[in-house]
């Protein structure tokens, strides 16, 4: 009985033997780096764009997120014949040398990098174009990258559908514990939305971190972006993926994106949260999943994206 079991395990493990290969493209001042994962015969290739702040190519960040969700997504896609490049954003991690100040960026800067990565990915895979798969804020970047010959289309995963400031306002209001700091938070949001920086030195420490003066110029730029309008300008295929247990980005965002791009394919995934993992419905388990790298990514997400990028016109 042991031999068949071993053979079965070997068969299941075989697709995971594909190894990451470090790749790079020119950046503004130094190289931009990423990890290329290529199956034996790639039917499509995607560029996976991470979310906000210091989030790395795998979906982790030093603020306590160790979900490894973007690496798991890449591995799952590889098993279905989809190659991927997971990127580190300019100024961060392996792309730290690309710019001197990681905070001196705009959404347009990130979008330009995404277009460059798409061209590189397509060439590496021997395909005419690459898909942009943006997670969370990465979806906004994918939207801003717009239309280009080497971009097949966009896959927007747990992506903002409302203006950035509106989403932050809703997130803060949703937590009753934030009630004592809401007035200051709203004052900061209003100032940034008006294109003005604000002194937060007298604010609660959590708000000082959220509205750190170093990132306020980036937030001002990000607040100007309207995801729905950007979606409406897209000419290629679009997929919207939204977990129904997401505590950060909600179905209201997915609906807004769908409103901008009625032709988009919408995948709503029950019981799946922001880091694309199944949770039991309790806030505790939802938040705990952010720091459990071994919890699998939702199969529905992998299957849906793989099916879409390999057959977008079905």
Per-region residue spans from a language model:
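Short, surface-exposed "cap/lid" segments of acyl-processing enzymes
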Residues: 41, 46-77
């Amino acid at each position: 009985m042991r031999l068949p079991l071993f053979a079965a395990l070997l068969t299941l493990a075989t697709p995971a033997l594909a190894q990451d290969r470090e790749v790079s493209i020119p950046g503004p001042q130094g190289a931009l780096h990423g990890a290329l994962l290529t199956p034996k015969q790639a039917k499509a290739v995607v560029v996976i764009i991470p979310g906000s702040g210091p989030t790395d190519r795998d979906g982790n960040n030093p603020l306590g997120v160790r979900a490894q969700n973007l690496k798991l997504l890449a591995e799952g896609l590889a098993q279905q014949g989809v190659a991927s490049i997971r990127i580190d954003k300019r100024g961060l991690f392996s792309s730290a040398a690309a710019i001197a100040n990681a905070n001196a960026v705009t959404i347009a800067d990130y979008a330009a990098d995404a277009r460059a990565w798409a061209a590189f990915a397509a060439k590496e895979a021997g395909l005419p174009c690459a898909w942009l798969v943006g997670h969370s804020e990465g979806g906004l970047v994918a939207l801003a990258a717009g239309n280009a010959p080497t971009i097949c289309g966009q896959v927007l995963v747990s992506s903002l559908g409302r203006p950035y400031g509106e989403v932050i306002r809703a997130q803060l209001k949703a937590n009753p514990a934030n009630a004592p700091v809401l007035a200051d938070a709203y004052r900061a949001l209003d100032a940034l939305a008006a294109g003005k920086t604000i002194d937060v030195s007298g604010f609660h420490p959590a708000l000082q971190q959220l509205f750190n003066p170093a990132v306020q110029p980036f937030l001002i730029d990000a607040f100007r972006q309207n995801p729905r309008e950007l979606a409406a300008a897209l000419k290629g295929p679009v997929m919207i993926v939204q977990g129904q247990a997401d505590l950060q980005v909600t179905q209201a965002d997915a609906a807004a994106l769908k409103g901008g791009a009625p032709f988009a394919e919408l995948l709503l995934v029950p019981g799946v949260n922001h880091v694309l993992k199944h949770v039991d419905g309790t806030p505790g388990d939802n938040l705990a999943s952010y720091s459990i790298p071994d919890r699998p990514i939702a199969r529905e997400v992998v299957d849906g994206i793989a099916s879409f990028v390999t057959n977008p016109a079905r």
